[in-house]
Amino acid sequence: MPLARIDLVQGKSPEYRRMIGDVVYEAVVSELKAPEGDRFQVITEHPAGDLIADPRYLGINRTADVVFIQVMMNVGRTLEQKKAFYKKIADGLHERLELRREDVLINLVEVGKENWSFGNGIAQYA
């Protein structure tokens, strides 16, 4: 059910990109309680300068290595689940890839269940 869009500066290895996807998927399952195998991700690299994130917004010091993670999902997660999700991703990317926690920007987009079709032109959750 969640669809993750991950945007980062180009030049990272396929293994690096895959690891970002793995960390996001694991957090989706463990913190948002999505079922195993519910992995839908689009990972896109951009030329330097095409990802713009204020380097000091909200007092967080970001670098040009910022990663944007946007997850579209069904409505219904608690604030506690969302906070745990953010932390799990930031910590996981830092531990596995040495990506600075400050460079991980996450956005959740909640939609109604009727807004999904996983194939065959059918709204499977409606």
Regions found by a protein language model. Give the residues of each.
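Interaction-mediating elements
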Residues: 1-126
